[in-house]
């Protein structure tokens, strides 16, 4: 699991998926801070993504670099400590250029519930599935040539 979390630290620009009217909505987002299996983000209450998150807090993110990817799902929570909000604002060079103060933004945490790590470089490719709710980790292979039981 640590390999997948480290990948997210190095690849902080992610595809961020929400839902509106039963239709997927996808955009690029930056992971602003990590704390174990919790990822922190910031946005504006004026953006559609904020309304989408309030209506349905279930999200997925995807980070990709070449043949390696990490996909996470979970629910967002807007209850973020003020200390974290200030840190995010102070440590992101883009936010002060766009907003006059840290309190002009809304911050939210994504507590990872499910995470998949894919590495298509080796043969057979690697798949690690982490269900943090159940506390389980499973592995597998990608592709019919590597399915268990096949000869």
Which residues does each predicted region cover?
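Charged, amphipathic alpha-helical segments
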Residues: 1-2, 43, 91-93
């Amino acid at each position: 699991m640590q390999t997948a979390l480290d990948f997210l630290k190095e690849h902080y620009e992610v595809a961020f998926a929400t839902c509106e009217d039963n239709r997927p909505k996808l955009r690029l987002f930056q992971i602003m801070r990590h704390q174990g299996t919790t990822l922190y983000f910031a946005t504006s209450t004026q953006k559609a993504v904020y309304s989408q998150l309030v209506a349905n807090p279930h999200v997925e993110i995807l980070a990709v670099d070449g043949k390696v990817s990490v996909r996470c799902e979970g629910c967002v929570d807007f209850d973020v400590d003020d200390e974290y909000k200030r840190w995010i604002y102070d440590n992101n060079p883009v936010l002060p250029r766009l907003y006059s103060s840290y309190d002009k933004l809304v911050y939210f945490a994504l507590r990872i519930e499910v995470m998949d790590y894919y590495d298509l470089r080796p043969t057979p490719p690697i798949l690690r599935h982490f269900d943090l709710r159940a506390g389980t980790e499973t592995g597998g292979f990608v592709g019919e040539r590597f399915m268990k039981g096949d000869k």
